[in-house]
Swiss-Prot record:
The lineage of its organism: Eukaryota, Metazoa, Ecdysozoa, Arthropoda, Hexapoda. InterPro entries: ATPase_NBD, Heat_shock_70_CS, HSP70_C_sf, HSP70_peptide-bd_sf, Hsp_70_fam. Forms a complex with Hsp83/Hsp90 and Dpit47. Residues 613-633 have a biased composition (Gly residues). GO terms for molecular function: ATP binding; ATP hydrolysis activity; ATP-dependent protein folding chaperone; heat shock protein binding; protein folding chaperone. This is Major heat shock 70 kDa protein Bb. The gene is Hsp70Bb.
Length: 641
């Protein structure tokens, strides 16, 4: 059973598998190699991926996207407050954690970001299973290099809810470097800078790749809240203000109008990567008012100028941390859809004094490609060029504990190789202190109040002694997923305590995960029932219209009038029933099918026997579903702006 690699993106996700010595990026059921990270809830079903994004203008409040911008964060995070201005769906606080509120099948539901991400992961898993023809459980999932401990844990939980055994959480730029290194057959030692600007996150990593097989991350930097969506937001704000100026109407109060404007803005942004001007035309955008306008590339660049410039700060930081200067970088590799923006490319090129950028790998697929390679390695694949690959990654943030006066004492410095283990000895702060509280933080600031709290535990039972005498050994053990275990031991008694940092404030409990796993299975069953219902309905519709057409077009004398009327009456009665029972259950459609077949089959057989020898009419074979007549064998598709 192969293991798959999943790039779980903010706006789009992608899945790949390594087999027969190469990576296959797997297309979904719509034939697309990337799948929108969208989940929609309607009064009858749940949609994931392309179908969800396609109906977003009709159902903006119940179509959820950007779960990656919520995952592992607290509700009061200022970044979430900023995003909520742009989201049409509702985000509420549930014990300090963000939850997404939607209407599903007439009921109000609340979903954790992990659940929404797990639904996208389930879709990617099903895409791979359909292609490979077998069930899949093992996967490598990628995260931005700058994701913190709680965001990594939450992503792992999402995989678990989706029924995946997460072999490893790996960093997106590292995965992209793997794709680049293996694809290009690099010789010698090369310093490679990966510039990864996606839909919602931004990472820079510098790696040394030796002979295309040893991948050593030297440093990493980034912004987990910068990407294509932020550029869309600037354009949407600009267009909404232009609409207000022209027509004295503010469309921002209307979620549907705002969504149609966002879709048009996203399309214009893409156009501006290859043209210097984009035209926006939206009919009846708000209160019947059409909206036609043009946006030039120069105007778009001006709107996003500060955001584009902000991409260079992490590049400088990564270079400083790797102790390299610009001239030591051999290759600059662009990853992520937003690196197609010409201004982003030209700023980066100027920063590196005109050095050519490497555009040779597919920016949308490189991360999934690398994840698929890592999945194959971790599941023991020894084939071809991956057998010698060794990947050495680093910790994105410093980790430490709070000591007297709220000082952050670091045990693991950022950019240290992982897995890694560090031990330091501490002591008590006051005489006869019976216990110590170990408070764990991550971040770069000198005081813990400015850093991110990960968790706390108490070590009690310290024998009475003057301050500074007891020896308490604290060990930080950072595993290959970038997830932290902390232990503390009092040396005189040998008393020890340890925790895996689970960031209990922001993280799901085991009970919640178990509940979500069960719910995910229930939703999958409901989706399957819905699919079966639609199939049965389509079969009945197809059969009834075929029979009706056959009878109506039967040559004179082939069928007596009484039989003809009997069949037509039964068909029309069934069509009326279909129209008034659109939400009937599968069993009801099957029952109607049986009833109709029983009634029509003998008459149709008689008609065919009478016509035997002559050229047969349009044959609706008795009692069988006639394939794909008209548009009735599948769902009807409507285009939405």
């Amino acid at each position: 059973m192969p293991a798959i690699g999943i790039d779980l993106g903010t706006t789009y996700s992608c899945v790949g598998v390594y087999q027969h010595g190469k990576v296959e990026i797997i297309a979904n059921d719509q034939g697309n190699r990337t799948t929108p990270s969208y989940v929609a809830f309607t009064d009858s079903e749940r949609l994931i991926g392309d179908p969800a994004k396609n109906q977003v203008a009709m159902n903006p409040r119940n179509t959820v996207f950007d779960a990656k911008r919520l995952i592992g964060r607290k509700y009061d995070d200022p970044k979430i407050a900023e995003d909520m201005k742009h989201w049409p769906f509702k985000v509420v606080s549930d014990g300090g954690k963000p939850k997404i509120g939607v209407e599903y099948k007439g009921e109000s539901k609340r979903f954790a970001p992990e659940e929404i991400s797990s639904m996208v992961l389930t879709k990617m898993k099903e895409t791979a299973e359909a292609y490979l023809g077998e069930s899949i459980t093992d996967a490598v999932i990628t995260v931005p290099a700058y994701f913190n401990d709680s965001q990594r844990q939450a992503t792992k939980d999402a995989g678990h809810i989706a029924g995946l055994n997460v072999l490893r959480i790996i960093n997106e730029p590292t995965a992209a470097a793997l794709a680049y290194g293996l694809d290009k057959n690099l010789k010698g030692e090369r310093n490679v800078l990966i510039f990864d600007l996606g839909g919602g996150t931004f990472d820079v990593s510098i790696l040394t790749i030796d002979e295309g097989s040893l991948f050593e991350v030297r440093s990493t930097a980034g912004d987990t809240h910068l990407g294509g969506e932020d550029f869309d937001n600037r354009l949407v704000t600009h267009l909404a203000e232009e609409f207000k100026r022209k027509y004295k109407k503010d469309l921002r109060s209307n979620p549907r109008a705002l969504r149609r404007l966002r879709t048009a803005a996203e399309r214009a942004k893409r156009t501006l990567s290859s043209s210097t001007e984009a035209t926006i035309e939206i009919d009846a955008l708000f209160e019947g008012q059409d909206f036609y306008t043009k946006v030039s590339r120069a105007r778009f660049e001006e709107l996003c100028a500060d955001l584009f410039r902000n991409t260079l700060q992490p590049v400088e930081k990564a270079l400083n941390d790797a102790k390299m200067d610009k001239g030591q970088i051999h290759d600059i590799v662009l990853v992520g859809g937003s690196t197609r923006i010409p201004k982003v490319q030209s700023l980066l090129q100027e920063f590196f004094h005109g050095k050519n950028l490497n555009l040779s790998i597919n920016p949308d697929e490189a991360v999934a490609y690398g994840a698929a390679v890592q999945a194959a390695i971790l599941s023991g694949d020894q084939s071809g060029k991956i057998q010698d690959v060794l990947l050495v990654d680093v910790a994105p943030l410093s980790l430490g504990i709070e000591t007297a006066g709220g000082v952050m004492t670091k045990l693991i410095e950022r950019n240290c190789r992982i897995p890694c283990k560090q031990t330091k000895t501490f002591s008590t702060y006051s005489d006869n202190q019976p216990g110590v509280s170990i408070q764990v933080y991550e971040g770069e600031r000198a005081m813990t109040k400015d850093n991110n709290a990960l968790g706390t535990f108490d070590l009690s039972g310290i024998p009475p002694a003057p301050r500074g005498v007891p020896q308490i050994e604290v060990t930080f053990d950072l595993d290959a997923n970038g997830i932290l275990n902390v232990s503390a031991k009092e040396m005189s008694t040998g008393k020890a305590k340890n925790i895996t940092i689970k960031n209990d404030k922001g993280r799901l409990s085991q009970a919640e995960i178990d509940r979500m796993v069960n719910e995910a299975e229930k939703y999958a069953d409901e989706d399957e029932k819905h699919r079966q219902r639609i199939t049965s309905r389509n079969a009945l519709e197809s059969y009834v219209f075929n029979v009706k057409q056959s009878v109506e077009q039967a040559p004179a004398g082939k069928l007596d009038e009484a039989d003809k009327n009997s069949v037509l009456d039964k068909c029309n009665e069934t069509i009326r029933w279909l129209d008034s029972n659109t939400t009937a259950e599968k069993e009801e459609f099957d029952h109607k099918m049986e009833e109709l077949t029983r009634h029509c089959s003998p008459i149709m057989t008689k008609m065919h026997q009478q016509g035997a020898g002559a050229a047969g009419g349009p044959g609706a074979n008795c009692g069988q579903q006639a394939g794909g007549f008209g548009g009735y064998s599948g769902p009807t598709v409507e285009e939405v702006d």
